[in-house]
Amino acid sequence: MNKVLEVRDLRTYYYTYEGVLKAVDGISYSIMQGQTLGIIGESGCGKSASSQSILRIVPSPGKIVGGQILLYDQEHPEKEPQDLTQMDPRGKEIRKIRGGRISMIFQEPMTSLSPLHTVGNQIMEAILLHQTKDRKEAEERAYEMLVKVGIGNPRERLQEYPHQLSGGIRQRVMIAMALSCHPSLLIADEPTTALDVTVQAQVLELMKELQSELGMSIQYITHDLGVIGEVADYVAVMYLGKIVEMGSLEQIFRNPLHPYTDRLMKSIPSLRKRKDGRKLESISGTVPIPIGIPPSCGFAGRCPVRKSGKCDCAVPKLTDRGDGHLVSCFLYGDEEEDSVEIPKPKRKKWGRSEG
């Protein structure tokens, strides 16, 4: 299988008046053709910031301060990969990639779709930008995409506005928009969170069918472990801007190594727990704001098995425990992460960070 995307030591920081907020703090991973990588973690762990970094849509005052995001050409594997971090976030080069080679499905379609434009015009926009300049051809492709995602009366739907559609249909429209140019990578940022359970199952099944048909890769972001169990091949667990554990779906779900991953798994409802009368276990405390945190394991303050004098004084290195199962925890070794100096932001005349 060919590599589609490789992220190397990515760091995305927000320079605020309170200090430097490390939303993404040195993560690395790869996605192969046709694979699904699930990224899980609580809110505030950096999942969405990592995906925004890939598309170079990090909102101000955020800034990519280090690392590489390498996008490989699937049609010409012999070509050198493009480093997206070196592109102007507002430039023509990255605009050719957004919606073309990389697409994204957002969490809430009602706030992502324009209320002023018809469904047809919004799907056609990406097609006209990346595929063809012929409006009739673009409209026909938009129609075909609505058929592909299972929307009834597609001709009529093309002329309707988002507020006229149900939540499930709106999310199918978002999927149609994202896949209209046949991207090699689809980023799905909690696309089923706002949907009821029945519609959620339908959308997940639809995405799996389309992935099999189109051969694309998916980066799926969610805090719902049940969803990840349905769609992912590999899983990365994020906490406080770092990947603390990564491996195959079976490795993460059957043999979680990091205390944070273990606590997440124990919080999943199951019929067995209900039958045995066991209560769901929760994780004490909340995810801290990643500003001014001294060098330490980010989970140390909430960890029931932390080593005093070690976990609260140094950052564990992400190491391979065998068969590609990576974990960042002092329970499995004493390797420490190298310290990194925080880059100073470039300032414009009016004192704001550059985008």
What are these model-predicted stretches?
Residues 160-165, 169:
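Conserved ABC ATPase signature
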Residues 56, 187-191, 195-278:
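P-loop NTP-binding/switch modules centered on Walker-like glycine-rich loops
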Residues 180-184:
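A short, proline-enriched helix->beta-strand linker immediately N-terminal to the Walker B motif
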Residues 1-4, 13-26, 57-62, 75-80, ...:
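A short, flexible loop at the N-terminus of ABC-type nucleotide-binding domains that lies
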Residues 40-41:
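The feature captures the beta-strand-to-loop junction immediately N-terminal to the Walker
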Residues 77-82, 249-355:
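Charged, flexible cofactor/metal-binding loops and thiol motifs
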Residues 136-156, 265:
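Conserved ABC ATPase "signature" region
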